[in-house]
Amino acid sequence: MSNKIIRSALEGHLKTWAAAQVPPLPVFLENRSKVPATGERHLRGDLIPAATLDPSQGAQHRRYHGMYQVGVFLPENEGTGDADDLAKAIEVLFKCPTVITKAGINVRIMQTPSIAQSRPDGAGFWMTPITIRYSADDFS
């Protein structure tokens, strides 16, 4: 249940920011039929949960942690400057120690997001991945 809440919290945080950009940046989410138009600048978010922990040994406390991977996709052959700027802005958006609350769950950003090497994605886009580590405790 909490992975669903965590995904919703992180996606909502990203989508709110992306909608406020000029022009707005579309965000494409996992397992959805919507796809970007040819050459359309966009973001993609993927939740990568790790093993759930039971710190209390009584099953009343579960700790969810993992990574939220955000990809910045810009048309190929337009340079790296815009991709670098967007990646840096997302790094700031999810800076440590950001806390995003959804349905009583506090999703904590555990460290500064990592911006990896950009590369072509094979579909006409230049992709810059940003890895955001999170943790959330569920006491329900």
Where are the language model's segments positioned?
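Short capping loops/turns at secondary-structure boundaries
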Residues: 3, 83, 121-125
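Acidic-leaning, charged glycine-interspersed low-complexity segments
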Residues: 21-22, 91-137
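Short, surface-exposed linear patches
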Residues: 50-52, 65-69, 90-96, 132-133
